[in-house]
């Protein structure tokens, strides 16, 4: 409901980002020690483990099977259902807004690492880590610089430790206001990450972006759940991924 939905989706989002943090952390170590090829092997192994978990422990709910429909007809029906859902103006406006958000989000992984590699001098931070926290220095630095993926990974780390706290305050806002404010905060954060060559601007900007993400993304899922007509839950929740796809395109 409106009271618990935002918190529930926030907790779900936090759990997703545990994997989002551990994956790059493991890949960072492996690519430094063994080269880039091992990362693809790592990804295949993790996917294989997930598949085994699903096969062994997931039980498909029993549903009554209707008459079989040709694949082409199913495809046409799916497109028609999406168009029908997009006739809901509230949903369409939010999805358009989130296209911009996901376009910004992808810069953390597509553009920012290249910017850090070419323009950010994190030598002082690298030296401090190696002198004071050798374990983190070994894991996070290479050739006198902090590895780019660890700047991006700060986003997932912030979500893990602060999502429940942020969701608690977002509950007190109207859904649309929370989404818009989150998008504005995220925009400020992305702007700061690319503003100067100072690594602290990159760190602070990524942290600010994470706050905006924590406000916007789970709240959108919660809002979609609230406005969804009964019986169309899967259809409306599926439209959540339309701006994700558009953000990857842009």
Annotate each predicted stretch with a short phrase.
Residues 110-147:
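Short amphipathic helix-loop junctions that connect adjacent transmembrane helices
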